[in-house]
Every structure is written in C-alpha cells, then in structure tokens.
C-alpha cells in the first residue's frame, strides 16, 4: 500500500494560553498542500532484503515512483534503515539531505509500535521518502504518522474510525 501524505500550510496561527499538559491552545487556519508530500509505503511481511519496501523499484533502476527518471545531476537520497528489537518492523527513511535522526524514533515507526501494543500486528516494512522540509512547521511528520495509522488499520482490518485514529495520533505527540 502506497500513499502521499500532504503537508499543511498555515494561513493564520495564533498561539493562545499554555495548558497544564505543556501544550498550547491554538487558533489556526490551514490548508493541506498536495504539491508538497512525502511518499509512504507499507508492505506486510518480514523479508527484510534491501529490495523490500520499494527500494529496488524506486531507486534500484535509477527511477522514481511514477516512473519519472532521475536527471543526471539529481542526487539519490541517503537511506537510513533499522529493524525493531522484536523483528516485526523494518523502517527505511530516505532523504536527499541525509537522515539525521534515529529511524526507529520516526513517527511512522512509533505509530506502528503503538498499534502493535494493542493489536499484535503482523510484521511490516515501512518505506518513507521525506521530500517535505523537516522542522519547517508544515506538519510533515504528523501527516506521515496519521497516514501510517490509517494504512495499518485498513491493511489489517482493525476497523479504527476517525475518532480512534485521532486518539492514537494524540498519543504520538504533536508538532
């Protein structure tokens, strides 16, 4: 299963009072931007070869998703990969600027691990190509996590409605 989580563009943001939980109440108006997206793929199974989770099909043949060719001067992203301690999750993150965070701490990995606590999910491979700017306030990581929760619910027939998905998402934090 593959999708493109969009970022959000804030048209207006007013930071209100600080709450007792350390977060702030916000008054905001934003729109999703479908021009700036990451690429998220989740595959069920535990074959953790380097060609899993789209790596071979996306970059092995020097091509991108959608069969767009890389130009000669375009860089192939840097990959960072990890497998969870229980061996049920392999996550690969690709980013042109390099991956400068532990990938098992990525919100997509955290989303899988959170659902796995309650549902004992099958093994999966997650591939995330980060093209949205990291740390720019566009909510790319949160969108990736939300789509991960939704995709896992659909893939494994968990039947999580939007309210339950939002509850899980809130446990992951906010940006």
Label the predicted regions.
Residues 69, 145-149, 165:
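Ubiquitous "structural anchor" signal
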